[in-house]
Amino acid sequence: MSKPELISFAICPFVQRSVITLLEKDVAFTSTYIDLADPPKWFLDISPFGKVPVLKVDDTVLFESAVINEYLDEVNPPSLQPVDPLRRAHNRAWTVFGQELLFTHYGLYTAADEATFEDRQADLHANLARLEGQLGQGPYFNGEHFSLVDAAYAPLFQRMTILEQRRPLGLVDTPKVTAWSEALLARPSVPASVSEDFTEQFLDYITAKEGYGPDWYRA
């Protein structure tokens, strides 16, 4: 079997989820970067939704980061999922919640007007408070052991931290979420999952847009 090929966009958080998993599993892989604003035909031919990540394993194409990560986990032991089926399903459910949080956060920093910005900010606060209630003593979602659900949240926390350092939103008091975020950002696979100039690329991506959200972070 040849090295798996991960088809990527440089600042995509869903790609980053899979890169973190590949690094945690110590799987050798290759990366092919595309421009999602002008995707090549060969990519559209293999990606049903026209989205990244896509993982090519020999002649088989996988898409959707959660599916890719579960495949990688199954074929590269030891597992990064709980043994108990109910706990494993619980992790999957909160991975989906993390996806919605990413979309909420994206909607915040791309908001066209102040009202939308404030609505997204309120949604983000409420959802972080909800997430707080799911966390135990840490340092990770399942306690001492890093899991796929942690890989799913790390890209969100990295982006939130970058923007909080640039201009704080005054997020709600969520000490467990904060501690979890700090533990994930300190894990070697997380900074290694993006380029050295990721912060600049991410901020350039935001501030190149028009609207209240980009203006907030240009200030």
Task: Locate each region found by the language model.
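Charged, glycine-enriched surface loops/patches
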Residues: 179-180, 219
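Long, charge-rich low-complexity segments
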Residues: 191-219
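Short glycine-/small-residue-rich flexible loop motifs, especially phosphate/cofactor-binding loops
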Residues: 19, 181-182
